[in-house]
């Protein structure tokens, strides 16, 4: 009688336990908040479906209870405790399963809601961002007059204030993104995404700030021009009244007095002409920033004043003025012709050099590396040709000025022919550059096209092999699947190589197009992985069908041999390659071995059913499976390490090529200007040189970072490869040292030219600066080198080494005064917008005096005695560098606080006081005294040599310079 209830009870218990086990396994699979939003939503839907299955589980538990009641009613008393115990186990398992279902679903749902709220806030921010981009996108509209320009400036300031107000929302968004990233780990909210959002905001803010600065400068120029016009009109009115007083019948003055009066008036004409020329020069800039109607009004006003001045000039020796003007015009034209011929000759030399170096067409059978080298060469030539565009404009302008001069036909033809040659070279370079880039794009697209063909073939194989009728079909399609897997591995290698060329793709095709290509590659890799895994599963299924017709030994021995072969091949790949192609080939081989390891794992699992019932065979299968898994883990480590090595070597090679190209262009430019001093007469040439020289400090930092990266690459290369990298770095440093030597020579030439201009213009008036001591320096507006104030011989003020101690004391006093001002600005509390503006103005004043201080310090270096050990000067150099670093950091940090608030540092500390302290914040607070103690120890280290009398401060100053560089460095840490 009890046999049937017992079987029902056992069956219901097994059904319930199996159902709960399946549910718990599904929950464990979905119990994860990491990953993209689509995956999170999928897990949320899965957990929701699982929660909806609670009623089904309840039914199964009820069946167990009913079966238990029936069994308890018919069983013996000795069996009841066991049945009741099993019932309690079932109930506890059911409660645990229900609790797990609820908690898992709630946790995933909370993270999803948090993410949704963040996306809403992000969308709101980007709507504002797009609105602001649209508002700032149109160019600045030209205005009619000064009042309209001031209104336009006010509107731009309102936009800038709106941008500043959005900083709070951005900070909140970044904080929420960081919190969300710690839970989901999705790249859309990682640190790079936060940096991109911050960078976009900074770009809009910079654009708004540039617009405000531009409009402020435009309004200021127009206002200054209007004041000068009013002053000139008052002078012109006074001169007209004097002239009219000397003319006509009503004039009672004698003839001698009239002539004397007219001669006195004529002496004022040069000053009036100079003032009018200055007004016309100012008007050029003002007209460029004024609407056509306003520009017409300004031009008419200038023409009217010019007409009045010319009428007055007619009264004084017309013929003599005409002859003198003719002679002066002829002399100016001859000088301009000489300058034009000199610049034309230099331009021809530059074109010949560029034509010989960078206009060879690309060979169609060139390799990818050769195409990249050609593209870089064409890019360098393109940049060099673009840098010659201002020179072409100058040649055309000078030729237009000399078009009325006789005997200029040959020079004019030469200029026109040279410009036509330049345009032809520019067009040819553009065609070659575009053709090379198009060829590279086709080369990089080939793996994607091949993958599309392979995907169709793989999908067709999967469809055909879904159900095979006999062993002959399996033997037919299994080699095809293996061939498809081999082709898949080859495609994966090619796509992996594309993913390692991020910097190269960005430099060739632009960041946006390169990002699109890399996204396509990433998507294609995912599709390939899915199909590859499907093919592996299908291959395993077919192999398992074949294995069923074999015994264990026949199936196991090939797997063991394949495992030993993989171990030997992996051991052979643990060496360090020589160069970048070797590392790339090693990476491809390791990825192929990784695919073979995965295939081996599937084959082992296919053999496992043959070992059932034999413990010895099962032990062999377990052992080879463990060995395969260990092998796969070591392969993953090797692949990750090799990918990192390839990525670092690619970055090193790319940056090395860019630096070498820039150094070559800069060296050629400096050598061309150093060889022909006549080009220094053109102010635009000197301005271009100053721009080039200003880029050298930034490139010096890049050279240092490249050396550090090169050391890292050398450690991860073979001895021969390390020698090659070291040789490349040595050549780079040689070319860099040669460039620095050229820079020093060029700076010396520029100073000499400035001194020559100053000596020629001895009539210029010297003015005192308002920010140095009374016994300080006298600054000439046209002379960047400061001089001491003396009343007798000027040479006594700047050429005698005996005055060096006095100059040193004066500079120390000036630097101490500037430091005091900076400290007062830092400690200033901002209560209103006016206070904020005052503080910004004071900081700008300090920054504006930095070039002046640099000139003073260079003067100290120039006048330093030859045998002076310069310990005091080295200490002063360190204090000067430290002041500049502190001023730069203060300009970035202090201006971030809004009116009515403390500074950015004080505000952050006050906010942290009320925020919940996490474990990381507590650790930082505990470590803060230790950090301060470490900084004090570092300060003591480079101050200790100052106490030794016999040693110089060179070591301490070198350390101080490196410490100041660390203070100013804002980029990522060097690798």
From Swiss-Prot:
One biological process term from GO is: regulation of cell shape
The chain's Perinuclear space topological domains, given as residue ranges, are: 947-975
Summarizing the function annotation, the protein's role is: As a component of the LINC (LInker of Nucleoskeleton and Cytoskeleton) complex involved in the connection between the nuclear lamina and the cytoskeleton. The nucleocytoplasmic interactions established by the LINC complex play an important role in the transmission of mechanical forces across the nuclear envelope and in nuclear movement and positioning. Probable anchoring protein which tethers the nucleus to the cytoskeleton by binding PLEC which can associate with the intermediate filament system.
Q: How does it assemble?
A: Core component of LINC complexes which are composed of inner nuclear membrane SUN domain-containing proteins coupled to outer nuclear membrane KASH domain-containing nesprins. SUN and KASH domain-containing proteins seem to bind each other promiscuously; however, differentially expression of LINC complex constituents can give rise to specific assemblies. Interacts with SUN1 and SUN2; probably forming respective LINC complexes. Interacts with PLEC (via actin-binding domain). Interacts with DST. Interacts with SYNE1.
Name the source's superkingdom.
Eukaryota
Write down the Pfam families for this protein, in alphabetical order. KASH, Spectrin
Q: What is known of its domains?
A: The KASH domain is involved in the binding to SUN1 and SUN2 through recognition of their SUN domains.
Its predominant location is nucleus
A GO-annotated cellular component: nuclear envelope
Topological relation to the membrane, as annotated: Single-pass type IV membrane protein
Please describe the post-translational modifications of this protein. The disulfid bond with SUN1 or SUN2 is required for stability of the respective LINC complex under tensile forces.
Give the species: Mus musculus (Mouse)
List the protein's name.
Answer: Nesprin-3
Which tissues is it found in, per the record?
A: Ubiquitous.
Q: Which family does it belong to?
A: Belongs to the nesprin family.
Write out the transmembrane intervals.
926-946
Report the GO molecular function annotations.
actin filament binding; cytoskeleton-nuclear membrane anchor activity
Which residues are in coiled coils? none
Q: Where does the record place the region Disordered?
A: 778-798
Localisation per UniProt entry? Nucleus outer membrane; Nucleus envelope; Rough endoplasmic reticulum
- SUPFAM superfamilies named among the record's database cross-references: Spectrin repeat
- Spectrin repeats by residue range: 220-325, 647-740
InterPro entries, per the entry: KASH (IPR012315), LINC-complex_assoc (IPR052403), Spectrin/alpha-actinin (IPR018159), Spectrin_repeat (IPR002017)
Record flagged with keyword Disulfide bond: yes
**Keywords attached to this entry:** Disulfide bond, Endoplasmic reticulum, Membrane, Nucleus, Repeat, Transmembrane, Transmembrane helix
Topology Cytoplasmic: residue spans? 1-925
Tell me which residues make up the KASH domain.
917-975
